[in-house]
Amino acid sequence: MVKWLKILITGFLVSCFYFPVIYKFFPVSNTKNLMAAFGLVCLLVVLIKKREFSVPKELLVILFLAGVVSIISLFAININQTPDRTYVTYIRSAIIWLSGAFGVCCAIWLTHKRVSVPLVVNYLAWVCVFQCVIALLNEFIPAFRTFIDATVEQGQGMLQDLGRMYGLGASLDVGGSRFAATLVAISFLLVQKSEDRDRIAQIPLVFSFIVITVIGNMIARTTLVGVGVGLAYLFFAELRMIGLRKFDKDYHTSLGAWLLVLLFAAPVCVFFYNTSLQFQEMMRFGFEGFFNYFEQGEWSTGSTSTLETMYVWPDNLKTWLIGDGYFENQRNDPNYIGVATRRGFYMGTDVGYCRYIFYFGIPGLLAISAVMIYAGVIAAQGLPKYSHIFLMGVLCNFIIWLKVSTDLFPFLSLFAALAFLTSDIEFLKQLRAEEEGEDEEESVPVPE
């Protein structure tokens, strides 16, 4: 019982980091900042235990790159004389995310006396499933939604005006992008379990993949990016394994796990689609493109039609080089002279690449891209066995920027922090020996 309570608390902390909100009974700060404070405390404890102060070179590099983003942003708004400081404080944001990620890894360590990529991914998967369940309860139980709205602040007024589903901090493209990143991580674990011939362990992973795919798309169709990349990875990995083991009679694919879960999930979805108008509308929104394709012969959605009009590019060299200094709508600038965009962001575009170029030019776009790539590199170098997860995470980030400007640094920072933590193995051994009274020579599960 105590163990499960610890796991639930740890899951709650992971959710606080991955899907931050502001609790109304503590409106001073959002949960991301609170997790960053917790991570800072954990870091201080580590340093005190080790009795030395050392900063990994990789951490300095990624903070340097984040600092470059802030400096370019500062140049952009000063040269253009705009008040939009959206990315001027990017260095601070990077520090907060990394500190919070370290706190998450330490929380998992304190609960399980070990921390690894599969553990982190499993926590992310079930936190995303939890968010999907909360979103469904919000839609079907008004009293529950009233309770959630009275407890947390997450811009729910705007979400309700837009008619969008939301969980506990998971909504719109921010939630969808993190669902997508989690899906590609789950797909990697599924391949790993298939190679290990552990079919039982695949069932909860397949279940979480399907739940996040179905309900996650109802929340934000950006989730489809992770669905596509994850399924493509599963497909090619399965082809590779079949080719390598085609004469091995004892080899079993993961098809059985998928069939088992789908035999349960498919009838449930069909039943509610045919009996609940509300669920039908949610399904048609989440998979609008597929419904349009099968009913009209054309794959299209309302958002893709709008997106086509948002690919707007600068018409002068100066904007390409240093941007216009606007990321948000220029109506927020009282000194702006000209016709402002009536709705949406600057130049009426929500496309990530366009917004970055209009804000701080190509140099800024390259700098923030370098942050994402290097975060993936840190994780891949420190955790080489799982490098495909980080490669797919970075890939998802750049695909998502074709639609919105949301980045996946929170996802990548988790594994970058885990990679940093692997350098403190001796400290982890000492901590476990102190807490469990084990001999220091006894082996300790460590991140791979």
Regions inferred by a protein language model and the residue ranges of each:
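N-terminal signal-anchor transmembrane segment
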Residues: 1-52, 71-77, 414, 446
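Hydrophobic transmembrane alpha-helices and their immediate junctions
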Residues: 232, 356-398
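Alpha-helical transmembrane segments of multi-pass inner-membrane proteins
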Residues: 121-146, 170-219, 223-237
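A juxtamembrane structural motif centered on a specific transmembrane helix
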Residues: 1-7, 49, 246-255, 261-266, ...
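Long extracytoplasmic/lumenal interhelical loops at the membrane interface
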Residues: 148-152, 291-360
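Aromatic-anchored transmembrane helix interface
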Residues: 61-68, 83-109, 119, 123, ...
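Transmembrane alpha-helices of multi-pass inner-membrane enzymes
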Residues: 184-189, 231-234, 389-399, 405-448
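Membrane-interfacial helix-loop-helix modules of multi-pass inner-membrane proteins that assemble, modify
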Residues: 79-81, 132-174, 341
